[in-house]
């Protein structure tokens, strides 16, 4: 059995209770090393840790799939919430682990934290993530359209190609007024959290 869990934006005390219980009992815990480091205080000390990077993630997820077929409880950790910008990684669980039905446990996304800090309601705004592979031109157009309609936008940038400075330049080029208010957050819930309010 494979669980896909969101471990939140960074603060290990913001994990859902169910996720904490699962991490304490899991036989195998896997994910990118930076993500694992954030939640490791909740790990079963006897669990097998399968750390991966971008270059070896297929190989490491194949290992996780093998453990799962042996009857071990496996947890794959996602940054933030699986449903906000994790579906490409989830596809790898389907393909590389050969697991058609991983159990998804949501986490808290940095987008939710940003919305809380700016009192921005999701029902009256647009959420958009550029943090994915492939062409983002349609997403960029959608962002412009939403802002021209007067909506607020909650945006996750694309490291390091389409970050806040590039997003701002693009929006101005597309006719969004330079005086539009922008709030930028870095490392939300981390000790080194930073925020900027600009136009």
Map each language-model feature to its residues:
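Class I S-adenosyl-L-methionine
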Residues: 1-105, 113, 153
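A contiguous loop/helix-start segment that scaffolds small-molecule binding in enzyme catalytic cores
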Residues: 2-4, 72-74, 82, 147-199
